[in-house]
């Protein structure tokens, strides 16, 4: 086959692939030829693509039934094997990886300053464990006659799809392409990426979040899909927006962000940066410097343009104040994507004069623009991201059902088919946020709004911490009575297979391989005569 014929065949295969229902709602800005020309000669099949297909079908079924796949962040293979018995997806958290699994071995808060391969490595760690326990289970079941297997419980599906945290992509667009490739190669079925700026990225529940313009994040989503297309993967992409609580943005270049960029409304206040530099030159620092900034904020009257317009109307002698404000707000809304120049021109036409509004004056010392997000801001971004993402996720400050409903309805009014994701964050105080009864139904209520995938980011971390604290305390006080009574016996009572940890770890499976390659005879089998796990045969 000629080089050209091979290329033509590749293009036709890609066209056929993209015409499947899987991509019905996906927008691509490049052609099949673009992808085919960037593929290698050898096709490397990715098992993670099978997992992506599995995840997509799983979420389709949940959407159909108005239910949700709900899961939490897994720390290690022990947690994954236990989760697989009850939950239908697995989450890998960047926060947990930052604190417990950085490839630099240096723990850190969730600032995405760990090495780029940290979360992909954790995905591979869990993916290999999933594959191993799946093989182990198959061998154990198939070693029995079919008549006996029919009496066993259904096998555990250890191959639950993994969704992982890609943070902001760890750099520019080429970094996003490479990071996506890592996740595909290491077993991820889906990844999420947020619209914060790299370098200033924070945990979704920290202060000081800096957004990138809408188009910049769309470019990241396109880069994810392009990378997955090059490597022949159906990887799911989840677009997260941190705009609900964001206070800064890197640039004013995208008109879709203009409504939410705040500016100074008092010309006499000057520029914040100039005022702060002057104060530093005077020797002010710490609390004194903060006081200077607070005073500038008070004097400058920093607000959004539509607020400045309303204040100007209300302060004037206009006879039709309500009508003027209503006419302006009818045309300039959180979802209208009105460029600032058009909003200013409309205001000038309605008032007969220009309003002083200067977002350059309000820029902070790092150069970022002031930004006032909120739920409608997140809706606007969610709609913009929808053509490039399989799911949309708004990070929020509280587990607020009314807010979740506002976001879901706002996005779905524009994009009815859109799947949504929700962070059931442990950063929320669930006992003060809602009653136990509401806690029990929260997932199902969100599912009815279209949140088909929900997750507790750090439940693996917190369950690990709780049992470790509880056992360490009891062990220090009661010695082996604590282990026997609070760990081992409950394992037996609950039927937790890890009580027989040698078997759980695959000792019998490996012994079987050893016998297979030695002709059926070996004196060094790990589970032979004398293994202490025989003590548990009557118990489990």
Curated annotation (Swiss-Prot):
Chain positions recorded as substrate binding sites: 93-95, 204-205, 240, 423-427, 457
Query: Which E.C. number(s) belong to this protein?
Result: 4.1.3.1, 4.1.3.30
Show where the record puts the motif Microbody targeting signal.
Answer: 538-540
Location comes to: Glyoxysome
Q: Which domain of life is it from?
A: Eukaryota
InterPro entries recorded for this chain?
Answer: Isocitrate_lyase (IPR006254), Isocitrate_lyase_ph_CS (IPR018523), Pyrv/PenolPyrv_kinase-like_dom (IPR015813), Pyrv_kinase-like_dom_sf (IPR040442)
Alphabetized, the UniProt keywords read: Glyoxylate bypass, Glyoxysome, Lyase, Magnesium, Metal-binding, Peroxisome, Tricarboxylic acid cycle
**Reaction(s) the record says it catalyses:** D-threo-isocitrate = glyoxylate + succinate; (2S,3R)-3-hydroxybutane-1,2,3-tricarboxylate = pyruvate + succinate
The pathway to which it is assigned is: Carbohydrate metabolism; glyoxylate cycle; (S)-malate from isocitrate: step 1/2
The residues annotated as the active site are 203
Q: Which residue spans adopt a coiled-coil conformation according to this UniProt entry?
A: none
Q: Give the matching NCBIfam families.
A: isocit_lyase
The name on file for this protein is: Isocitrate lyase
Q: Which organism is it from?
A: Yarrowia lipolytica (strain CLIB 122 / E 150)
What lineage, starting at the top, does this entry show?
Eukaryota, Fungi, Dikarya, Ascomycota, Saccharomycotina
């Amino acid at each position: 086959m000629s080089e050209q014929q091979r290329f033509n065949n590749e293009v036709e295969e890609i066209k056929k692939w993209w015409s499947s229902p899987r991509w019905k709602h996906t927008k691509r800005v490049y052609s099949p030829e673009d992808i085919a020309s960037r593929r290698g000669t050898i096709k490397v099949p990715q098992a993670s693509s099978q997992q992506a297909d599995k995840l997509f079908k799983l979420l389709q079924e949940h959407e159909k039934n108005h239910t949700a796949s709900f899961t939490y962040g897994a720390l290690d293979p022990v947690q994954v094997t236990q989760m697989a018995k009850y939950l239908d997806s697995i989450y890998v958290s960047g926060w947990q990886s930052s604190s417990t699994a950085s490839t630099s071995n240096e723990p850190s808060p969730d600032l995405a300053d760990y090495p780029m391969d940290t979360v992909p490595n954790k995905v591979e760690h869990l993916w290999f464990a999933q594959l191993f326990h799946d093989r182990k289970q198959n061998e154990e079941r198939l070693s029995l006659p079919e008549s006996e297997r029919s009496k066993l419980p259904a096998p555990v599906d250890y191959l639950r799809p993994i969704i992982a945290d890609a943070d902001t992509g760890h750099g520019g667009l080429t970094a996003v392409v490479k990071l996506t490739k890592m996740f595909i190669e290491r077993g991820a079925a889906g990844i999420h990426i947020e619209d914060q700026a790299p370098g200033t990225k924070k945990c979704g529940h920290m202060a000081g979040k800096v957004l990138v313009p809408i188009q910049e994040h769309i470019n990241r989503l396109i880069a994810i899909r392009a990378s997955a297309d090059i490597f022949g993967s159906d990887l799911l992409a989840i677009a997260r927006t941190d705009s609900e609580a964001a206070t800064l943005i890197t640039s004013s270049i995208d008109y879709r962000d203009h409504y939410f960029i705040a500016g100074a409304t008092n010309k006499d206040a000057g520029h914040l940066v100039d005022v702060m530099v002057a104060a530093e030159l005077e020797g002010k620092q710490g609390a004194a410097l903060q006081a200077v900034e607070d005073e500038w904020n008070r004097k400058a009257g920093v607000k959004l343009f539509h607020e400045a317009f309303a204040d100007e109307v209300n302060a004037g002698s206009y006879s039709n104040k309500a009508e003027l404000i209503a006419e302006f707000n009818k045309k300039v809304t959180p979802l209208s994507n009105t460029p600032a120049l058009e909003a200013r021109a409309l205001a000038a036409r309605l008032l007969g004069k220009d309003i002083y509004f200067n977002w350059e004056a309000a820029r902070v010392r790092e150069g970022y623009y002031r930004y006032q997000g909120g739920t409608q801001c997140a809706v606007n971004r969610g709609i913009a991201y929808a053509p490039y993402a399989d799911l949309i996720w708004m990070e929020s400050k509280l587990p607020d059902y009314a807010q979740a409903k506002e976001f879901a309805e706002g996005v779905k009014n524009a994009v009815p088919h859109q799947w949504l994701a929700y962070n059931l964050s442990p950063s929320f105080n669930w006992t003060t946020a809602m009653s136990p009864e509401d806690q029990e139904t929260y997932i199902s209520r969100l599912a009815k709004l279209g949140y088909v995938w929900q997750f507790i980011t750090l439940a693996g971390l917190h369950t690990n911490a709780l049992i470790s604290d509880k056992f360490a305390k009891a062990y220090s006080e009661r010695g082996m009575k604590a282990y026997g009574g609070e760990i081992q016996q409950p394992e037996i009572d609950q039927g937790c297979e890890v009580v027989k940890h040698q078997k759980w770890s695959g000792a019998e499976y490996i012994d079987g391989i050893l016998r297979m390659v030695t002709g059926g005879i070996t004196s060094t089998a790990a589970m032979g005569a004398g293994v202490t796990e025989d003590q548990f045969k009557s118990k489990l």
